[in-house]
Amino acid sequence: MEGVDCSMALADAAAGSPRDLSLVPERLQRREQERQIEVERRKQKRQDQEVEEEKSGFFAAAFARERAAVEELLRGEASAERLEEAANRLQGLRKLLNDSVLFLAAYDLRQGQAALAQLQAVLTERRQELQPKKRFAFKARKKDAAGTAQVDAAPVTSAAPSPPVTKEEEGAPGASWACGFSNLESQDLEKRAEELHQRDVLLSDLTNCTVKLCGNPNTLRLAKARGCKVLCGPVTTSVFLEDCRDCVLAVACQQLRVHTTKDTRVFLQVTSRAIVEDCSGIQFAPYTWSYPGIDKDFQDSGLDRSKNNWDQVDDFNWLARNVASPNWSILPEEERDIQWD
């Protein structure tokens, strides 16, 4: 009621002479100004929310339409032409999602990324179905010294455990990771193009390791790394960092998300805006790593080499628009001279 009385008093004074307005206590004038500012702020907030809802509605309709088209292509009889069209439309879906990151709610973003991962998995499966199967043939039996027949021994499996199956991470492709390294210390590790092409890579629980990934993976996840240097060729979709410390990462990708990571330098080429959350001491610089065959890997990845938003970063823990986030910064030029080899 006091705010209403204040407004009525100011209105009465304004209807009279300037002298009447000067008689209104300064405290009431200031309170009325604050009330008007708050009213304007709420009005602007409602307008912004309406715009965001309109954008989200457009995204949801466009995404659902294109997703249905890709699913229809993948359900039909498999052919190289249909799968190529499905791959192209799936790439368009990825671009739509990446271009909408700024206004999408976190839940909607995760749902979109999960849908993309599922479609990519089905596309990969259908492509494998088109590949010619190897013919089965019996091996000749060997005879021992006594002349008795012996059946070939069963193939020996590797004693090294396969990479662990992880629960589905935000935006990460679902069930399992195709290749990677885990639980190693002070090692120089490398995978080549034929091992990486369009596969999902997991690097986890590494300490003081140097990892070179010379090829075109589909996704890359780096988790629980300490003091590592990770150099990666162009990644077709997303790169995820989680719980890393004192690392150096060089990567080109469509989207980068960094969680719970500290004191890490990222040499980046990215076509969307990078995202950091619950991080500190993250430094960004342009992607400068190179290796023989990188041009072909960029071509296979579908990334636009002329587009690089390496210094466009959104911090989900820093909402002040006009104040720079203290959790990330640009790596000074004099500190970018890295000896990759």
Curated annotation (Swiss-Prot):
Which GO-annotated molecular functions does the record name? GTPase activity; tubulin binding
Q: Is the keyword Glycoprotein assigned to this protein? A: no
- What are the disulphide bonds in this sequence? none
A GO biological-process term:
post-chaperonin tubulin folding pathway
> What keywords would UniProt list here?
Acetylation, Chaperone, Cytoplasm, Phosphoprotein
**Stretches assigned to the C-CAP/cofactor C-like domain:** 163-318
Segments of skewed composition (Basic and acidic residues) = 34-49
Any one cellular component term from GO for this entry? cytoplasm
Q: State its location(s).
A: Cytoplasm
Kindly list the positions at which N-acetylmethionine occurs in this protein: 1
Q: Which InterPro entries match?
A: C-CAP_CF_C-like, CAP/MinC_C, CARP_motif, TBCC, TBCC_N, TBCC_N_sf, Tubulin-bd_cofactor_C_dom
**Which residue intervals make up region (Disordered)?**
34-55, 148-173
Main location class: cytoplasm
Its quaternary organisation is: Supercomplex made of cofactors A to E. Cofactors A and D function by capturing and stabilizing tubulin in a quasi-native conformation. Cofactor E binds to the cofactor D-tubulin complex; interaction with cofactor C then causes the release of tubulin polypeptides that are committed to the native state.
The entry's family comment says:
Belongs to the TBCC family.
Role summary? Tubulin-folding protein; involved in the final step of the tubulin folding pathway.
Q: What is this protein called?
A: Tubulin-specific chaperone C
Q: What is the organism of origin for this protein?
A: Mus musculus
Gene from which the chain derives:
Tbcc
